[in-house]
């Protein structure tokens, strides 16, 4: 049997999915051959839209569909993608089991018209305030430099400023002591770039909402606010500008790409930087998480990321098109991705592949059942290793799976443990903005307004921090 899918792959890895060990094994196991069309990840959205415009020539589905809510509703209305709820109930016991355990995911996948148009990606690591997604842009401060200069970890915005000044004034000593190539940079970030943004530093100003990636926050009475018009935001941005005028901020922080940001990190040049996991930029032995800073008027808070209550969730991960003749086969094949031993591999990588860097070894759990055990990656960057083998697509890794079907990734466990210790006590707000599936008109309206307003707000944010 054969099915055809469109997918994407990172530029650094093979562009032929059938060369990947995960798909080779799946073909043996299911006896289904997949005819892939693969686009490089960073060109994917344009190429995908072009492919979907060729109505008579559609594949059976999109495996890594990357569809927004608006895409799902628009393509459903045009008859390009099909409703899936009956297929799920008939042919997909693995996905059904996930929905039974966590009914909220079925609700979140269901469009306002009552249909389900896509298969989701779900990654649980902790839940609620303890979910790993609760904070994205973690500030990591160079503990080695602090110790060398005899300084404590700062706990207020003023103390941080003094520490950054010390990094600036002792740049030559630090350079010599730690044999650093290039100039010492007290603080670096990539403005408006998700986890690399420095907004977490300004949570202590004014009302304490700071800023979030999409600039929405929820008050404890349930009111939704826009962060960039709050008093505290303005005060916080002024303070960040002050740091710029004192030569404490990397001049490239407003223009640099990820690769430049990482290259400087690998040369150990940062006193403070922001990202999901410091190991992707430098190493986690020299740095510690900088705790929530108390602002000038004594406020201290950590605003959680929106949507993080339900852990990692991507609604529009995988779709089937109206050209799909054998929908039962397609659904049954996709359901294999939701098998508890399969999902972690699709998400992170595989085991037992010769001449390749494996993420796992196949081991056993305490009851003697098969379990994927994370290998020690040594000096390898987790992201690079994952990109070589993982396939992403629709999957579900649930909290119950850890130590039963898969061990927690070491980097995630390290991040979770440190996050809980450093930030949990300061996550004051009750709510985060949830993952709402609105009607096509509302989605369209929101995306129009939001695109323009977000663009303008972020332009101004960068401009004000840089130029005042």
Regions of interest found by a model, annotated:
Residues 9-18, 125-140, 147-153, 190-246, ...:
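Extracytoplasmic/periplasmic substrate-binding proteins
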Residues 33-39, 251-252, 288-290:
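General small-molecule cofactor/ligand-binding pocket signal
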Residues 1-159, 171, 198, 210-216, ...:
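Conserved N-terminal structural module of periplasmic/extracytoplasmic solute-binding proteins
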Residues 39, 63-64, 254, 273-276:
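Short beta-strand and adjacent tight-turn residues that come in two discontinuous sequence segments
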Residues 79-109, 164-168, 178-217, 264, ...:
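Carboxylate/His-rich catalytic cores and anion/metal-binding grooves
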Residues 340-460:
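Conserved small-residue motifs centered on glycine
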Residues 85, 89, 112-196, 218-264, ...:
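Helix-loop-helix "hinge/cap" segment bordering the ligand-binding cleft or interdomain interface
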């Amino acid at each position: 049997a054969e099915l055809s899918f469109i997918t994407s792959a990172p530029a650094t890895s093979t562009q032929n999915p059938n060369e990947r060990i995960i798909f080779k094994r799946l073909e043996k196991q299911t006896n289904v051959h997949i005819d892939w069309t693969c686009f490089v990840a960073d060109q994917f959205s344009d190429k995908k839209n072009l492919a979907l415009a060729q109505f008579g020539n559609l594949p059976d589905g999109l495996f890594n569909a990357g569809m927004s809510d608006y895409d799902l509703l628009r393509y459903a209305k045009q008859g390009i993608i099909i409703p899936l709820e009956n297929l799920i109930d008939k042919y997909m016991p693995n996905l059904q089991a996930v929905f039974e355990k966590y009914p909220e995911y079925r609700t979140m996948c269901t469009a306002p018209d009552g249909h389900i148009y896509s298969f989701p990606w779900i990654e649980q690591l902790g839940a609620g305030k303890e979910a790993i997604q609760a904070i994205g842009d973690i500030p990591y401060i160079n503990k080695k430099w602090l110790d060398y200069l005899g300084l404590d970890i700062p706990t207020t915005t003023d103390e941080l400023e003094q520490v950054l000044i010390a990094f600036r004034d002792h740049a030559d000593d630090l350079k010599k002591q730690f044999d650093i190539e290039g100039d010492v940079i007290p603080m670096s970030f990539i403005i408006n770039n998700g986890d690399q943004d420095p907004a977490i530093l300004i949570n202590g100003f004014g009302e304490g909402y700071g800023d979030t990636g999409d600039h929405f926050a929820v008050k404890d009475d349930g009111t939704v606010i826009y962060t960039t018009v709050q008093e505290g935001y303005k005060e916080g941005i002024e303070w960040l500008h002050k740091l710029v005028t004192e030569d404490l901020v990397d001049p490239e922080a407003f223009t640099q790409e990820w690769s430049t940001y990482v290259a400087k990190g690998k040369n150990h040049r940062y006193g403070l930087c922001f990202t999901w996991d410091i190991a992707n930029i430098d190493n986690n032995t020299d740095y510690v998480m900088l705790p929530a800073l108390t602002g000038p008027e004594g406020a201290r808070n950590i605003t959680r990321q929106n949507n993080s209550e339900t852990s990692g969730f991507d609604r529009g991960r995988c779709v089937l098109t109206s050209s799909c003749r054998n929908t039962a086969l397609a659904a049954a094949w996709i359901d294999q991705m939701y098998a508890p031993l399969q999902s972690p591999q699709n998400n992170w990588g595989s085991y037992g592949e010769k001449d390749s860097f494996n993420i796992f070894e196949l081991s056993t759990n305490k009851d003697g059942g098969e379990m994927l055990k994370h290998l020690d990656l040594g000096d390898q960057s987790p992201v690079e290793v994952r990109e070589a083998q993982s396939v992403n697509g629709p999957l579900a890794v649930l909290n119950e799976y850890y130590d039963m079907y898969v061990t927690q990734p070491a980097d995630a466990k390290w991040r979770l443990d440190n996050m809980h210790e450093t930030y949990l006590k300061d996550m004051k707000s009750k709510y985060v903005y949830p993952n709402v599936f609105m009607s096509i008109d509302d989605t369209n309206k929101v995306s129009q307004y939001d695109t323009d307003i977000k663009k303008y707000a972020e332009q101004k944010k960068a401009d004000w921090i840089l130029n005042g």
